[in-house]
């Protein structure tokens, strides 16, 4: 494993450990960001199941002409995820940025999810 991969894995683990301490049974909003797409899901760690998910690969996103590599797509994914989570009865989550900096696409997704009804 390269030094960069080890550093990223440690950062991701450190963030997840801190989240477990503060979660208090709340579901986790997990974000994965690749160079071309962005994915997000609300996970109930106590049951081990995904409650809601959204990504820039979905048909509705592709038809709108959004690629996942920009802030507009991240906002759309955040809004879609929040709507699906609220429909499932989830209103409070813990934000898991997954070791990514809270900046750019990750921040845009989080802000859109907040505006659409999720609180964290």
From Swiss-Prot:
InterPro entries: Ribosomal_uL18_bac-type, Ribosomal_uL18_bac/euk. One of its GO terms (biological process) is translation. NCBIfam families: L18_bact (TIGR00060). Belongs to the universal ribosomal protein uL18 family. Keywords: Ribonucleoprotein, Ribosomal protein, RNA-binding, rRNA-binding. Part of the 50S ribosomal subunit; part of the 5S rRNA/L5/L18/L25 subcomplex. Contacts the 5S and 23S rRNAs. This is one of the proteins that bind and probably mediate the attachment of the 5S RNA into the large ribosomal subunit, where it forms part of the central protuberance. It holds the Pfam family Ribosomal_L18p. Gene3D superfamilies: 3.30.420.100. One of its GO terms (cellular component) is cytosolic large ribosomal subunit. This is Large ribosomal subunit protein uL18. SUPFAM superfamilies: Translational machinery components. GO terms for molecular function: 5S rRNA binding; structural constituent of ribosome.
